[in-house]
Protein backbone atom coordinates (compact mmCIF):
# COMPACT_ATOMS: atom_id res chain seq x y z
CA UNK A 1 0.00 0.00 0.00
CA UNK A 2 1.39 3.43 -0.91
CA UNK A 3 1.83 6.15 1.70
CA UNK A 4 -0.95 8.11 0.02
CA UNK A 5 -3.47 5.27 0.13
CA UNK A 6 -2.44 4.31 3.69
CA UNK A 7 -3.08 7.84 4.93
CA UNK A 8 -6.46 8.03 3.22
CA UNK A 9 -7.52 4.58 4.42
CA UNK A 10 -10.78 4.75 6.41
CA UNK A 11 -11.07 8.48 5.65
CA UNK A 12 -13.90 9.23 3.26
CA UNK A 13 -13.91 12.58 1.43
CA UNK A 14 -16.28 15.12 2.99
CA UNK A 15 -18.44 16.91 0.46
CA UNK A 16 -20.29 18.77 3.21
CA UNK A 17 -17.23 20.64 4.48
CA UNK A 18 -17.70 19.30 8.00
CA UNK A 19 -15.62 21.08 10.66
CA UNK A 20 -12.60 19.24 12.01
CA UNK A 21 -10.16 20.33 14.69
CA UNK A 22 -6.54 19.57 13.89
CA UNK A 23 -4.03 19.53 16.74
CA UNK A 24 -1.33 21.58 15.09
CA UNK A 25 2.17 22.20 16.43
CA UNK A 26 3.75 23.66 13.30
CA UNK A 27 5.95 20.59 12.92
CA UNK A 28 6.37 18.24 9.98
CA UNK A 29 3.82 15.64 11.05
CA UNK A 30 0.97 17.92 12.11
CA UNK A 31 1.42 20.12 9.03
CA UNK A 32 1.02 17.05 6.82
CA UNK A 33 -2.13 16.06 8.73
CA UNK A 34 -3.56 19.58 8.41
CA UNK A 35 -3.00 19.54 4.63
CA UNK A 36 -4.54 16.05 4.43
CA UNK A 37 -7.67 17.03 6.37
CA UNK A 38 -8.21 20.00 4.09
CA UNK A 39 -7.64 17.87 0.99
CA UNK A 40 -10.30 15.45 2.23
CA UNK A 41 -12.84 18.28 2.23
CA UNK A 42 -13.03 19.08 5.93
CA UNK A 43 -13.23 22.69 7.07
CA UNK A 44 -10.05 22.82 9.17
CA UNK A 45 -9.83 24.50 12.56
CA UNK A 46 -6.21 24.47 13.71
CA UNK A 47 -5.40 24.30 17.43
CA UNK A 48 -1.90 25.08 18.66
CA UNK A 49 -0.90 25.05 22.30
CA UNK A 50 1.88 26.96 23.99
CA UNK A 51 2.57 24.68 26.93
CA UNK A 52 5.94 26.14 27.89
CA UNK A 53 7.89 24.06 25.38
CA UNK A 54 11.50 25.15 24.95
CA UNK A 55 11.04 25.07 21.16
CA UNK A 56 8.34 27.76 21.25
CA UNK A 57 9.34 29.01 17.78
CA UNK A 58 7.13 26.20 16.47
CA UNK A 59 4.14 28.38 17.41
CA UNK A 60 5.33 31.18 15.11
CA UNK A 61 5.74 28.57 12.38
CA UNK A 62 2.22 27.29 13.06
CA UNK A 63 0.72 30.76 12.60
CA UNK A 64 2.49 31.20 9.27
CA UNK A 65 1.63 27.73 7.97
CA UNK A 66 -2.03 28.00 9.02
CA UNK A 67 -2.35 31.12 6.87
CA UNK A 68 -0.43 29.48 4.03
CA UNK A 69 -2.60 26.35 3.94
CA UNK A 70 -5.80 28.24 4.68
CA UNK A 71 -7.83 27.35 7.75
CA UNK A 72 -11.21 28.53 8.94
CA UNK A 73 -9.66 29.59 12.23
CA UNK A 74 -6.40 29.15 14.11
CA UNK A 75 -6.40 29.25 17.89
CA UNK A 76 -3.29 29.36 20.06
CA UNK A 77 -4.05 28.37 23.65
CA UNK A 78 -1.50 29.00 26.39
CA UNK A 79 -1.20 26.35 29.08
CA UNK A 80 1.91 26.50 31.25
CA UNK A 81 3.09 22.95 31.86
CA UNK A 82 6.46 24.19 33.08
CA UNK A 83 4.76 24.46 36.48
CA UNK A 84 4.73 20.66 36.54
CA UNK A 85 8.03 19.98 34.76
CA UNK A 86 9.00 16.35 34.33
CA UNK A 87 10.25 16.69 30.76
CA UNK A 88 13.27 18.03 28.90
CA UNK A 89 10.83 20.04 26.80
CA UNK A 90 9.37 21.91 29.77
CA UNK A 91 12.23 21.89 32.29
CA UNK A 92 15.45 23.65 31.29
CA UNK A 93 17.39 21.72 33.94
CA UNK A 94 16.85 18.48 31.98
CA UNK A 95 19.07 18.24 28.91
CA UNK A 96 17.65 17.24 25.53
CA UNK A 97 19.53 14.06 24.53
CA UNK A 98 21.55 14.06 21.31
CA UNK A 99 22.06 10.30 21.11
CA UNK A 100 19.35 7.67 20.57
CA UNK A 101 17.96 6.05 23.71
CA UNK A 102 17.35 2.36 24.23
CA UNK A 103 14.64 0.77 22.09
CA UNK A 104 11.15 1.19 23.56
CA UNK A 105 12.49 3.35 26.39
CA UNK A 106 10.30 6.36 27.12
CA UNK A 107 12.62 9.34 26.55
CA UNK A 108 13.07 12.42 28.75
CA UNK A 109 11.43 14.46 25.98
CA UNK A 110 8.11 12.82 26.86
CA UNK A 111 5.85 15.46 28.43
CA UNK A 112 3.61 13.85 31.09
CA UNK A 113 0.13 13.24 29.65
CA UNK A 114 0.69 15.94 27.02
CA UNK A 115 -1.33 14.45 24.18
CA UNK A 116 -4.19 13.59 26.52
CA UNK A 117 -4.27 17.21 27.69
CA UNK A 118 -4.01 18.66 24.18
CA UNK A 119 -6.50 16.25 22.63
CA UNK A 120 -8.97 17.10 25.39
CA UNK A 121 -8.73 20.76 24.36
CA UNK A 122 -9.25 19.77 20.72
CA UNK A 123 -12.24 17.63 21.69
CA UNK A 124 -13.82 20.50 23.61
CA UNK A 125 -13.42 22.87 20.69
CA UNK A 126 -14.78 20.31 18.22
CA UNK A 127 -17.88 19.78 20.35
CA UNK A 128 -18.49 23.52 20.65
CA UNK A 129 -18.22 23.80 16.85
CA UNK A 130 -20.72 21.01 16.34
CA UNK A 131 -17.99 18.90 14.76
CA UNK A 132 -17.24 15.25 15.36
CA UNK A 133 -13.72 14.92 13.97
CA UNK A 134 -10.36 15.52 15.62
CA UNK A 135 -7.06 14.95 13.82
CA UNK A 136 -3.54 14.70 15.22
CA UNK A 137 -0.15 13.66 13.92
CA UNK A 138 0.64 10.62 16.05
CA UNK A 139 3.18 8.25 14.55
CA UNK A 140 4.17 4.82 15.85
CA UNK A 141 6.55 3.65 13.11
CA UNK A 142 9.57 5.87 13.68
CA UNK A 143 8.95 5.12 17.34
CA UNK A 144 10.47 7.47 19.90
CA UNK A 145 8.86 5.67 22.82
CA UNK A 146 5.90 7.98 23.41
CA UNK A 147 2.96 6.06 24.92
CA UNK A 148 0.41 8.58 23.61
CA UNK A 149 1.35 7.97 19.96
CA UNK A 150 0.26 4.32 19.82
CA UNK A 151 -2.81 2.98 17.96
CA UNK A 152 -4.29 1.59 21.19
CA UNK A 153 -4.03 5.02 22.78
CA UNK A 154 -5.88 6.64 19.87
CA UNK A 155 -8.65 4.04 20.09
CA UNK A 156 -8.93 4.48 23.85
CA UNK A 157 -9.13 8.27 23.62
CA UNK A 158 -11.88 7.99 21.01
CA UNK A 159 -13.83 5.71 23.35
CA UNK A 160 -13.37 8.20 26.17
CA UNK A 161 -14.47 11.07 23.92
CA UNK A 162 -17.79 9.38 23.31
CA UNK A 163 -18.31 8.63 27.00
CA UNK A 164 -17.34 12.06 28.30
CA UNK A 165 -19.23 14.47 26.01
CA UNK A 166 -22.83 15.47 25.50
CA UNK A 167 -22.52 14.86 21.76
CA UNK A 168 -21.06 11.40 22.29
CA UNK A 169 -23.65 10.31 24.85
CA UNK A 170 -26.55 11.58 22.74
CA UNK A 171 -25.28 9.97 19.50
CA UNK A 172 -27.92 7.72 18.00
CA UNK A 173 -25.56 5.80 15.72
CA UNK A 174 -21.89 5.48 14.82
CA UNK A 175 -22.16 8.24 12.23
CA UNK A 176 -22.86 10.74 15.00
CA UNK A 177 -20.00 9.67 17.27
CA UNK A 178 -16.69 11.45 17.76
CA UNK A 179 -13.83 10.20 15.63
CA UNK A 180 -10.17 10.70 16.49
CA UNK A 181 -8.05 10.41 13.36
CA UNK A 182 -4.33 9.67 13.35
CA UNK A 183 -3.89 9.14 9.59
CA UNK A 184 -0.08 8.99 9.54
CA UNK A 185 0.28 6.66 12.51
CA UNK A 186 1.45 3.73 10.37
CA UNK A 187 3.69 5.70 7.99
CA UNK A 188 7.45 6.07 8.13
CA UNK A 189 8.87 9.58 8.24
CA UNK A 190 9.86 9.19 4.58
CA UNK A 191 6.29 8.23 3.64
CA UNK A 192 4.92 11.20 5.58
CA UNK A 193 7.23 13.52 3.65
CA UNK A 194 6.23 11.93 0.34
CA UNK A 195 2.56 12.36 1.24
CA UNK A 196 3.02 15.98 2.23
CA UNK A 197 4.98 16.71 -0.92
CA UNK A 198 2.08 15.31 -2.94
CA UNK A 199 -0.24 17.67 -1.04
CA UNK A 200 2.01 20.67 -1.70
CA UNK A 201 3.33 21.11 1.84
CA UNK A 202 6.25 23.54 2.17
CA UNK A 203 8.39 21.79 4.76
CA UNK A 204 10.88 24.64 4.91
CA UNK A 205 8.41 26.47 7.14
CA UNK A 206 7.95 23.64 9.65
CA UNK A 207 9.78 23.40 12.98
CA UNK A 208 10.43 19.94 14.43
CA UNK A 209 13.58 20.46 16.49
CA UNK A 210 13.35 20.11 20.27
CA UNK A 211 15.99 22.84 20.61
CA UNK A 212 15.01 25.19 17.79
CA UNK A 213 16.14 28.77 18.36
CA UNK A 214 13.91 31.84 18.19
CA UNK A 215 14.29 31.89 14.40
CA UNK A 216 13.06 28.31 14.12
CA UNK A 217 16.49 27.03 13.14
CA UNK A 218 17.16 23.40 14.07
CA UNK A 219 20.03 22.04 16.16
CA UNK A 220 20.53 19.07 13.83
CA UNK A 221 21.45 16.84 16.78
CA UNK A 222 18.33 15.88 18.77
CA UNK A 223 16.19 12.79 18.14
CA UNK A 224 13.54 14.80 16.30
CA UNK A 225 16.16 16.31 13.98
CA UNK A 226 17.72 12.89 13.39
CA UNK A 227 14.41 11.29 12.38
CA UNK A 228 13.62 14.25 10.13
CA UNK A 229 17.02 14.06 8.39
CA UNK A 230 16.65 10.32 7.80
CA UNK A 231 13.12 10.86 6.49
CA UNK A 232 14.11 13.36 3.83
CA UNK A 233 17.03 11.18 2.76
CA UNK A 234 14.89 8.05 2.44
CA UNK A 235 12.13 9.99 0.66
CA UNK A 236 14.65 11.30 -1.88
CA UNK A 237 13.45 14.82 -1.15
CA UNK A 238 15.85 17.72 -0.59
CA UNK A 239 15.91 18.63 3.10
CA UNK A 240 14.78 22.29 3.33
CA UNK A 241 15.34 22.49 7.09
CA UNK A 242 17.10 25.64 8.33
CA UNK A 243 19.92 24.68 10.68
CA UNK A 244 21.73 26.72 13.31
CA UNK A 245 25.23 27.84 12.42
CA UNK A 246 27.80 26.18 14.66
UniProtKB/Swiss-Prot annotation:
The keyword Transit peptide does not apply. Its EC number is 6.3.4.20. This is 7-cyano-7-deazaguanine synthase. It comes from Polynucleobacter asymbioticus (strain DSM 18221 / CIP 109841 / QLW-P1DMWA-1) (Polynucleobacter necessarius subsp. asymbioticus). ATP binds at residues 24-34. Catalyzes the ATP-dependent conversion of 7-carboxy-7-deazaguanine (CDG) to 7-cyano-7-deazaguanine (preQ(0)). It holds the Pfam family QueC. Binds 1 zinc ion per subunit. Pathway: Purine metabolism; 7-cyano-7-deazaguanine biosynthesis. The keyword ATP-binding applies. Its cofactor is Zn(2+). GO terms for biological process: queuosine biosynthetic process. GO terms for molecular function: ATP binding; ligase activity, forming carbon-nitrogen bonds; zinc ion binding. InterPro entries: QueC, Rossmann-like_a/b/a_fold. Keywords: ATP-binding, Ligase, Metal-binding, Nucleotide-binding, Queuosine biosynthesis, Zinc. Zn(2+) binds at residues 209, 219, 222, 225. The gene is queC. Belongs to the QueC family. It catalyses: 7-carboxy-7-deazaguanine + NH4(+) + ATP = 7-cyano-7-deazaguanine + ADP + phosphate + H2O + H(+).
Amino acid sequence: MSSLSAAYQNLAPRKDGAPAVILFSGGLDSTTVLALAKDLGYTPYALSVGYGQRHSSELAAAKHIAKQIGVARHEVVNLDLTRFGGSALTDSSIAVPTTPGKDQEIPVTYVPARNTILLSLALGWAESLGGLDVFYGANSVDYSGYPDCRPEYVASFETMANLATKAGVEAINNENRFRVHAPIISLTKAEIIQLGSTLGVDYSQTVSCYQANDLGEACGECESCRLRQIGFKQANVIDPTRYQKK
